[in-house]
Amino acid sequence: MNIQALLSEKVRQAMIAAGAPADCEPQVRQSAKVQFGDYQANGMMAVAKKLGMAPRQLAEQVLTHLDLNGIASKVEIAGPGFINIFLDPAFLAEHVQQALASDRLGVATPEKQTIVVDYSAPNVAKEMHVGHLRSTIIGDAAVRTLEFLGHKVIRANHVGDWGTQFGMLIAWLEKQQQENAGEMELADLEGFYRDAKKHYDEDEEFAERARNYVVKLQSGDEYFREMWRKLVDITMTQNQITYDRLNVTLTRDDVMGESLYNPMLPGIVADLKAKGLAVESEGATVVFLDEFKNKEGEPMGVIIQKKDGGYLYTTTDIACAKYRYETLHADRVLYYIDSRQHQHLMQAWAIVRKAGYVPESVPLEHHMFGMMLGKDGKPFKTRAGGTVKLADLLDEALERARRLVAEKNPDMPADGLEKLANAVGIGAVKYADLSKNRTTDYIFDWDNMLAFEGNTAPYMQYAYTRVLSVFRKAEIDEEQLAAAPVIIREDREAQLAARLLQFEETLTVVAREGTPHVMCAYLYDLAGLFSGFYEHCPILSAENEEVRNSRLKLAQLTAKTLKLGLDTLGIETVERM
């Protein structure tokens, strides 16, 4: 149930009846304060100006045409022309009942789209580090939300599995006679990478061999392809362990590495030349873009093929966008890549559009994100100044959570404690990131993220168990409760019910904007409203069974909404804490 969409359409029709143009925007928003009702229509200002009327005068005319019978108990004009809408308790009660009767909590299914989501993208032969965390978990929250809404989502893990480094690695593996490459762990491989790089930089004969191996690999030589596949397999096997620990939905089947697009690159360069978009410049093949200017104010040149015949990331990204539209039949493509790549993507997509590879009707969206910083406000590093491995970060999260939950549950059996510590520790790391607006940098702080108060995973997980405890104490007859009506008489009941029914609106924003922090803020607010409701509206000691059952149903929908909301974020819930 999307109340905002329902009210927007009703207000829009009333505005048109009052003389507003057909494309008018009612600007219906959830009210910021209780005294302004549940929703507020703010669109009168802009429209009244066009009509040469006072906004309040237009609002009065709109009210004469606005039929919210059975939806609102009160509609009033406030200030210069805002329309405040107070939802009818009977309307709220009816839709709470409907939400409880549905597995989807009454959330409608929009028109189905095929949506490609590009996220995570680690490099082969390197261990995942904290820099991969944001793309992986923000992208996964978007995927879960879109799939819940009913879209066909194609996960695209654009791993860095191609390039000159592979000649270097294969040459070094061969030199070390590493026949057991498939059994190596990634930690070994990282050491190999460092040693290979050192030799590549210092030993010209080795470097020449590595360069030859790249050519052989790129020409499809089976021995070199097999060695390359081993490196990819070792990497992705190790990465899958991290994905599983993080409770993200990526699998080996979602790998669509850079190598996938290699066969397309010569054809793309030839096609861009044929279309007059690419030209030769100082031996390289370049596309000049009027939309981007260099320091001299001239169109910026984007190289798509180097003088030596090699291709660039831009060429791969052009091929990638083309493939996602032509082969995967994407209606929409989302890229969870950090903000530093923005200009690079915009240039690649400008070429894609000019070449006609992806029509304007298919959005290519860069859902960029900021950096994860240490308490000193600088990029998050180890004490020695090195890159923090993601596996080490998760180990520390688990260790800290173990201490925390053991302190609070001294009598819990070891296996239960481990399961709880895992849910709390991993949940804390993910939620601390997801609860921040992705476009900003954020400070990584263990104490804050593991706190049991504030907008944190432990608080949300605890809030969920608190609602469940009401049911354990109530010893409910499920069938009897299902048949009981919902009655809303108290203000706190109405506020909780209205917020519960805003779940679909929240999902819609997350799906549209790729902003999981909006879901975190909604769930945190919901938990706070439930807390106030629980305190002021006795459930188990209610004045009669009818009120008790009605309040139990509000509690039941709260539990289901918290669980489902946290699930769209990839945060595990627990039954007891």
Curated annotation (Swiss-Prot):
GO cellular component assignments: cytoplasm
Taxonomic superkingdom: Bacteria
Catalytic reaction list: tRNA(Arg) + L-arginine + ATP = L-arginyl-tRNA(Arg) + AMP + diphosphate
GO biological process: arginyl-tRNA aminoacylation
Enzyme Commission no: 6.1.1.19
One Pfam family linked to the record: Arg_tRNA_synt_N
SUPFAM superfamilies: Anticodon-binding domain of a subclass of class I aminoacyl-tRNA synthetases, Arginyl-tRNA synthetase (ArgRS), N-terminal 'additional' domain, Nucleotidylyl transferase
Stored InterPro entries: aa-tRNA-synth_I_CS (IPR001412), Arg-tRNA-ligase (IPR001278), Arg-tRNA-synth_N (IPR005148), Arg-tRNA-synth_N_sf (IPR036695), ArgRS_core (IPR035684), DALR_anticod-bd (IPR008909), Rossmann-like_a/b/a_fold (IPR014729), tRNAsynth_Ia_anticodon-bd (IPR009080)
Protein localization: Cytoplasm
Motif ('HIGH' region): 122-132
Residues making up the signal peptide according to the UniProt record: none
Single GO molecular function: arginine-tRNA ligase activity
Annotated keywords: Aminoacyl-tRNA synthetase, ATP-binding, Cytoplasm, Ligase, Nucleotide-binding, Protein biosynthesis
Keyword NAD applies: no
CDD domains, per the entry: Anticodon_Ia_Arg (cd07956), ArgRS_core (cd00671)
SMART domains: Arg_tRNA_synt_N, DALR_1
Gene3D superfamilies: Arginyl tRNA synthetase N-terminal domain, HUPs, Isoleucyl-tRNA Synthetase, Domain 1
Main localization, broad class: cytoplasm
Residue ranges the record marks as coiled coil: none
Subunit organization: Monomer.
Similarity-based family: Belongs to the class-I aminoacyl-tRNA synthetase family.
NCBIfam families, sorted: argS
Protein's name in the database: Arginine--tRNA ligase
Source organism of this protein record: Escherichia coli O9:H4 (strain HS)
